Amino acid sequence: MDLIKIAEEAFATGKQHPSFKAGDTITVAYRIVEGSKERVQLYRGVVIKIAGHGDKKRFTVRKMSGTVGVERIFPIESPAIDSITVNKVGKVRRAKLYYLRALTGKKARIQEKRVNQ
């Protein structure tokens, strides 16, 4: 049991990300290594689900690339994640938004929650 905790602490990045939930539109700056070059790719989409807990937490982001829906799963403690930015706070009543996969066009939009700042 202690070996698992030691391994988790060794791989923990310790980065602080903003809090977000399912339905929020976020931008993930993800570092990609291509050969000897490294670049940052921005991936913007709607958070469909958040799964796991602690260091093993991961979230799924769905975006539309043309007419095709693309989903990507990001571990929250991934060292390749440069930053996470919350663009919109969505107004949803579910924790898992799998129903968005079947919707297209304006039906797939999520209402924006008004946030006082």
From Swiss-Prot:
InterPro entries: Ribosomal_bL19, Ribosomal_bL19_CS, Ribosomal_bL19_sf, Translation_prot_SH3-like_sf. Pfam families: Ribosomal_L19 (PF01245). Disulfide bonds: none annotated. Keywords: Ribonucleoprotein, Ribosomal protein. One of its GO terms (biological process) is translation. SUPFAM superfamilies: Translation proteins SH3-like domain. The keyword Chaperone does not apply. One of its GO terms (cellular component) is cytosolic large ribosomal subunit. Coiled coil: none annotated. GO terms for molecular function: structural constituent of ribosome. The keyword Ribonucleoprotein applies. Belongs to the bacterial ribosomal protein bL19 family. This protein is located at the 30S-50S ribosomal subunit interface and may play a role in the structure and function of the aminoacyl-tRNA binding site. This is Large ribosomal subunit protein bL19. It comes from Phocaeicola vulgatus (strain ATCC 8482 / DSM 1447 / JCM 5826 / CCUG 4940 / NBRC 14291 / NCTC 11154).
